[in-house]
A protein has these predicted regions:
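Helix-loop-helix hairpins in multi-pass membrane proteins, especially solute transporters
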Residues: 2-134, 152
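Hydrophobic alpha-helix/TM-entry signal in multi-pass membrane transporters
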Residues: 13, 20, 36, 131, ...
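Transmembrane-helix signature of multi-pass solute transporters
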Residues: 19-29, 107-114, 171-175, 247, ...
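Hydrophobic/small/kink-forming positions within alpha-helical transmembrane segments
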Residues: 25, 48, 79-83, 140, ...
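A residue-level signal for alpha-helical anchor/packing sites in multi-pass solute transporters
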Residues: 56-57, 61, 91, 118, ...
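A gly/Pro-rich, aromatic-decorated transmembrane alpha-helix motif that marks the paired
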Residues: 76-95, 144, 148, 335-351
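Hydrophobic transmembrane-helix bundles of small-molecule transporters
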Residues: 94-204, 211, 237, 363-364
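12-transmembrane solute porter fold
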Residues: 103, 134, 160-165, 181-381
Length: 382
């Protein structure tokens, strides 16, 4: 996102698309685990470039009064990715695993052509500003260790190693934040985190994505191991969630222009929490319909939450810092998803016989906490 403010969001986005497409081909052609890991790592850089400036581009494309609609359309498109298990199951039913990556190539090329043709340039670029390599390295070290520590709690890692990693994180994080506080355009947007509305939106987003991943990771195991559904049936039963999100996200975008976005996000999270609780309380032998309406309820709540929350977050930042806000949005999502996936592993370890309900109950509680935080934004202004 910092590169987007310097070079232009369009350039960073198209470079990310090109890298993602090329590395998808490399993944498909990989002949060993080592080459696949290298290709996937580079693919992650491409995906990060795309995701980090996506919201900033939306802010440029849509007038302020229609920003909610733009976010809604974007959330609709993003929700298609939640149908990944269904699409993957379909691909694997007719082909081998390399096709999971090969399918990205024509999609990436098409997106690249459209990006060159239609994406706008930044209205204002940071003149005379250089990319802070030192801050980037400190950022990677700090957040990398945070994710490693979260993962370590779910594995049999010796406590002394975890404590050592925590000490290193605190040490690096302290000096990283102190350094960024002295920068006019910090890589870690300390200036944006001083805006209460922005920070509350970030925290709400983290809680929501933790809750989402608690369901998305644990529930497929329940469908296959407990209910005995095959891969295709599992993918199809997960599909109502993204479909409901696709319907509700654009609607939330329109509603966010007419009502308080904090209220709308809070209502969405309450619905989401109810959906997770209903999944946790599934009967012992549920029918497909029992599962479908509960998944749709989760997707509906998440769709109503995501669009207005993202609109509040990006709208709270100055236009010149849209890149930093967009990057923080992606960071909040990644942090929440990482924590959620790790918590699922912890639930499997602590509650081996009831891991799925435990994960969903926890997700329901976290979604409610997110709703409380969301409602606290009602009278706040950027």
């Amino acid at each position: 996102s910092s590169m987007g403010e310097i070079w232009g969001y369009r350039k960073v986005y198209t470079i990310g698309l090109l890298l993602f497409s090329c590395t998808s081909l490399a993944c498909a052609l990989s002949d060993s685990l080592f080459t696949l890991i290298i290709a996937r790592t580079l693919q992650g850089f491409g995906a990060a470039a795309i995701a980090s400036v996506n919201t900033a581009l939306i802010r440029i494309i849509y007038p302020k009064r229609f920003l909610g609609r733009g976010m809604g359309i974007n959330a609709l498109v993003v929700s298609v990715s939640d149908a990944g298990p269904t699409i993957a199951a379909g691909i694997l039913s007719v082909g081998n695993w390399p096709w999971l990556f090969a399918i990205n190539i024509p999609i990436g090329i098409t997106a690249l052509i459209l990006s060159f043709k239609f994406l706008p340039q930044n209205p204002v670029k940071a003149v005379g500003r250089k990319f802070d390599v030192t801050a980037a390295l400190m950022n990677a070290l700090t957040f990398g260790l945070v994710i490693a520590i979260i993962e370590a709690f779910t594995h049999d890692v010796h406590i002394s190693l975890i404590i050592a990693a925590i000490v290193i994180v605190l040490f690096c994080g302290y000096f990283y934040i102190r350094r960024e506080e002295r920068q006019a355009y910090p890589l870690l947007p300390i200036d944006l985190l001083r805006i209460p509305l922005f920070t509350l939106s970030i925290i709400t987003s983290v809680f929501s994505f933790i809750a989402q991943m608690l369901a998305m990771v644990s529930f497929p195991f329940f469908l296959q191991r407990v209910l005995g559904r095959d891969e295709v049936a599992t993918g199809l039963l997960l599909t109502p969630w993204p479909l409901a999100t696709m319907v509700c996200a654009p609607l939330a975008g329109i509603l966010s222009e007419k009502m308080n976005a904090g209220v709308l996000s809070g209502i969405g999270l309450i619905i989401f929490s109810g959906g997770l609780f209903s999944l946790a309380e599934l009967p012992a032998h549920p029918s497909d319909l029992d599962i479908i309406w509960r998944m749709a309820l989760c997707g509906c709540g998440f769709g109503l939450f995501q669009t207005p929350n993202n609109s509040l977050m990006i709208g709270a930042a100055p236009e010149s810092r849209s890149g930093g806000a967009s990057g923080m949005l992606g960071t909040a999502r990644l942090l929440g998803q990482t924590c959620g996936a790790s918590l699922v592993a912890l639930m499997f370890k602590l509650f081996p016989g009831h891991s799925m309900p435990a994960a969903l109950w926890l997700g329901s509680v976290l979604a409610l906490i997110g709703a409380v935080i969301s409602f606290s934004r009602i009278n706040r202004k950027a």
